[in-house]
């Protein structure tokens, strides 16, 4: 038999140690054995796991934050799942509840009275206070300048913060006699207590979670509203769009090494055989409702009903989410952390060609635009989700992924005539995805199988999502590698058939088939070049042929080409001239869009408007720099962009993509979702 692996669980009390040893005795005979390691505190456990003296422990959000910091760098590998009315979930939302009829907004909170669940609690303290510090509403210079409680006492006129002992003002609004009213478990503590404090008129705002009003006063729900970060108010049920942060469930953390699979197979097995609804006399979780605090929440929270595996790419920062992560960061800040870069925009550039263009833009914009350089679009989406970069212009396929990751479209590129430009577009601009073949071939949409294909890149709209979505609907198979005999789809696995025709940059073998301008056949022009030199069909957009024939493209491969050398494939099996794309196309799709985090959207919209006045097609400074044009392929923006079109505030990525396209990408992504999409789907499902 193969040697058994041991998983060393870290415990922080004798009650936990006892439960852990009992679990060891009840374990189903598995290839994994359990040993229990007791430490004094969760921080000692984090250190022990980091030093390879233990393997795993389940922690709450604030502790997951610490475990993820250097030097420990632990990552969440499984999330606890809790039951809620309407299904199971792995998170809740922190909200600010106010009475309807009071007319103040988030910016008017200074001098108001406030109700909190308790000092140091997520929804009641860490998130609201961290957020107000992050927004620079509460002025606090960090630990050096005194404890954050003093800064909060200066901000609100009076509060009830159960457990606060340093500042009298922070429990002035609490209920009870002088001795007990400030206690952690006083009458106004917890979610229902903080809500009662608002109800009794002791506070103007209560910081609670999204279910609190429903659980305490369902029939009075209409008398309350939520304060949103964007400066508006919304009904109590709109907590998904009007919350201060999503609070992640407790998570099991571990070192980022090969042991993760063993820990998960051990956890999955135990949760299955010893979890809720099993006949075992040992309970892995709970049961809930224990009276003795010493016996509560041992190893896992009592309210957990199961564990859910966390996708590979997830780290603590993605797991906790931007709002929660920044709130905790703001509460722990010392002098070293930088304040928010309010009037700058951190643009995300991909590869060295975009870097040099972005650096020039940064110089001419007097530093209003700064650049973050990464290897591909996916890395940029992660960076923006984490708040370490602000914006990037993406193809619709990536707008989908970015949307699932919580980013929103801010402006769209427009390529048609300039009449579109002056209009404030409610509707995004569109283009057509087409399939182009050589006129001399006998190929139709119905006999494409086994031919040689050329794609702009995996995951992009015209080059991949549309044609492969249609093929997927037709064949029902996810084996795209088998459909064409060979091809070039930059971003495919290096040994796949769909990298066979790719060329790289000619300088570096490792660059063959990469999804960036380092691959000759990347993008629209690249895919057309691949058709001319090697392929049978190219999946591009309606204008690509016109942009590269009759001398428009001076490169050797395009010499002598005319429109008449090519035809379009229609989905009904017919063929058409390349100018007939309005009647013969694979789909009508939205243009590229700049995406950003929702709370940055307006800032970026304004900033881009200003930049376009200077460096756009008719910019006053376009001799110095042109933001849409570039020497090589489409850098930062598509080169044909005539202008950026403002999208209406609050537009969702689904609306931007349109039903037809959204459905096609969603269906395609059931096949093999990228690691990033798995992470964001996990977070979106919460």
From Swiss-Prot:
GO terms for molecular function: metal ion binding. InterPro entries: Transferrin, Transferrin-like_dom, Transferrin_Fe_BS. Monomer. Glycans are attached at residues 473, 548. It is found in: Secreted. Signal peptide: none annotated. Residues 333-341 are annotated as: Connecting region. One of its GO terms (biological process) is iron ion transport. PROSITE patterns: TRANSFERRIN_LIKE_1, TRANSFERRIN_LIKE_2, TRANSFERRIN_LIKE_3, TRANSFERRIN_LIKE_4. GO terms for cellular component: early endosome; extracellular space; plasma membrane; recycling endosome. This is Ovotransferrin. Belongs to the transferrin family. It comes from the Eukaryota. Keywords: Disulfide bond, Glycoprotein, Ion transport, Iron, Iron transport, Metal-binding, Repeat, Secreted, Transport. Disulfide bonds join 10-45, 20-36, 115-197, 160-174, 171-182, 228-242, 348-380, 358-371, 405-680, 421-643, 454-530, 478-671, 488-502, 499-513, 570-584. Transferrins are iron binding transport proteins which can bind two Fe(3+) ions in association with the binding of an anion, usually bicarbonate. It is responsible for the transport of iron from sites of absorption and heme degradation to those of storage and utilization. Serum transferrin may also have a further role in stimulating cell proliferation. Ovotransferrin has a bacteriostatic function. Its concentration in avian egg is the highest concentration of any transferrin in vivo. Pfam families: Transferrin.
């Amino acid at each position: 038999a193969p040697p058994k692996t041991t998983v060393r669980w870290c415990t922080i009390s004798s009650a936990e140690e006892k439960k852990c040893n009992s679990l060891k005795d009840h374990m189903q005979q598995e290839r994994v054995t359990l040993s229990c390691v007791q430490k004094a505190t969760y921080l000692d456990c984090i250190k022990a796991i980091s030093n390879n003296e233990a393997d795993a422990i389940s922690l709450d959000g604030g502790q997951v934050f610490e475990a993820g910091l250097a030097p420990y760098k632990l990552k969440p590998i499984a999330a606890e799942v809790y039951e809620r009315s309407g299904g199971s979930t792995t998170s809740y939302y922190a909200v600010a509840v106010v009475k309807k009829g009071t007319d103040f907004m988030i910016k008017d909170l200074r001098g108001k009275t406030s109700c909190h669940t308790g000092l140091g609690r997520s929804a009641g303290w860490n998130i609201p206070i961290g957020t107000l510090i992050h927004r620079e509403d509460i002025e606090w210079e960090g630990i050096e300048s005194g404890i954050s409680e003093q800064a909060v006492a200066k901000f609100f006129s009076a509060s009830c913060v159960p457990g606060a002992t340093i500042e009298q003002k922070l429990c002035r609004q609490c209920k009870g006699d002088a001795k007990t009213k400030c206690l952690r478990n006083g009458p106004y503590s917890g979610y229902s207590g903080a809500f009662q404090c608002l109800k009794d008129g002791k506070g103007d705002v209560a910081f609670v979670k999204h279910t609190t009003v429903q659980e305490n006063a369902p029939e009075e729900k209409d008398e309350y509203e939520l304060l949103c970060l964007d400066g508006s108010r919304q009904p109590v049920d709109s907590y998904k769009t009007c919350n201060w942060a999503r609070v992640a469930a407790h998570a099991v953390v571990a070192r980022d090494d090969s042991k993760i699979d063993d820990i998960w197979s051990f956890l999955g097995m135990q949760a299955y055989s010893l979890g809720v609804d099993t006949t075992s006399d040992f309970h892995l979780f709970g049961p809930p409702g224990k009276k003795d605090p010493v016996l509560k929440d041992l190893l896992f929270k009592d309210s957990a009903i199961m564990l859910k595996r966390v996708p590979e790419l997830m780290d603590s920062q993605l797991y906790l989410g931007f709002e929660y992560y920044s709130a905790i960061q703001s509460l722990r800040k010392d002098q070293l952390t930088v304040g928010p870069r309010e009037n700058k925009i951190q643009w995300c550039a991909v590869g060295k060609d975009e870097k040099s263009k972005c650096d020039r833009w940064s110089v001419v914009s007097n530093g209003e635009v700064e650049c973050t350089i990464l290897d591909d679009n996916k890395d940029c989406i992660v960076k923006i989700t984490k708040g370490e970069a602000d914006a990037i212009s993406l193809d619709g396929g990536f707008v989908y992924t970015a949307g699932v990751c919580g980013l929103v479209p801010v402006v769209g590129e427009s390529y048609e005539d300039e009449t579109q430009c002056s209009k404030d577009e409610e509707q995004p601009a569109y283009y057509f995805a087409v399939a182009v073949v050589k006129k001399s071939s006998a190929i139709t949409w119905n006999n494409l199988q086994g031919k040689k294909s050329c794609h702009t890149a995996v995951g992009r709209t015209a080059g991949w999502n549309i044609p492969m979505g249609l093929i997927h609907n037709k064949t029902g198979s996810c084996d795209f590698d088998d459909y064409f005999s060979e091809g070039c789809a930059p971003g495919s696995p290096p040994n796949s058939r769909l990298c066979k025709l790719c060329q790289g940059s000619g300088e570096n073998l490792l660059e063959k088939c990469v999804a960036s301008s380092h691959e000759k056949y990347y993008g629209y022009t690249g895919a057309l070049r691949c058709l001319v030199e090697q392929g049978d069909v190219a999946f591009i957009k309606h204008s690509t042929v016109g942009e590269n024939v009759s001398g428009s493209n001076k490169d050797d491969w395009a010499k002598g080409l005319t429109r008449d050398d090519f035809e379009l494939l229609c989905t009904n099996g017919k063929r058409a001239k390349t100018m007939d794309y309005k009647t013969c196309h694979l789909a009508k799709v939205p243009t590229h869009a700049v995406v950003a985090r929702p709370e940055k959207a307006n800032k970026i919209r304004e900033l881009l408007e200003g930049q376009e006045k200077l460096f756009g097609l008719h910019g006053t400074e376009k001799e110095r720099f042109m933001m849409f044009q570039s020497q090589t392929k489409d850098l930062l923006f598509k080169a044909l962009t005539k202008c950026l079109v403002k999208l209406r505030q609050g537009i969702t990525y689904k609306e931007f993509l349109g039903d037809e396209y959204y459905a096609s990408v969603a269906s395609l992504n059931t096949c093999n979702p990228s690691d990033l999409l798995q992470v964001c789907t996990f977070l979106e499902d919460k």
